[in-house]
Amino acid sequence: GDSATFTETGKATYTAVFKDEDFDTQTVTVETPMKSSPEVKMIKNGASVRTSEPYGIRWAAGIRTADWNKLIEVYGENNVKAGVIVAPLDYVKQADEFTISAFNAASLQYADIVSDSFNAEVNAMAEGYSGFYASLVNIQAGNLNRKFAARAYVAVEKDGVVTYYYGEYSAENQARSIYEVSKSAVASSTEKETVKEFAKGVLNKVIDVTVENGNAVLTEIAGYA
């Protein structure tokens, strides 16, 4: 099964174990084009190393604060959630679109990272937005050079129907590997030494992986965690 662990305010982490995943849901889901209000987006292009244990790769996402407050007013706090869908880039290319319903329909594995609160550090990155970090941790060695993509969303539930509003997505801006972000961390003049040590460990573990059509392919590992 899957699990989400909330470790710090506005910092959701997700450890994914996808073997024998059951994709059945208890509610109907409806996908809505990103041009629909409310406005949700990735606060920063790219990704970074998660700076506390367990280390991993993290993205900064957010929703326009005025839109979030209106949704809470209309639907109630328990019926609104902000999150990020994360999946291997090669899976994104297989799906009809990068949405939860498309991945479920294709039986493709993904992580649905839901934040339980907003983070002041991310809020400060974009005026007028409430933001959070979404992290994928405990990535197996065979996936260190594999790109993972992320897309922000906000979802509302009414009468058993869940409606998703997605932010823009592009692989160029939102797909990174832990190898790539580790290289950036090591080169940084401001990153903590503990994070740099983790990043150096990642770089030391990365070996040549099989590449097919430009995609890093899993070695003999069942799922990723």
Where do the protein language model's features map onto the residues?
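Short, surface-exposed linear motifs at loops/turns and structural transition points
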Residues: 34-225
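Extracellular modular ligand-binding repeats in secreted and cell-surface proteins
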Residues: 1-35
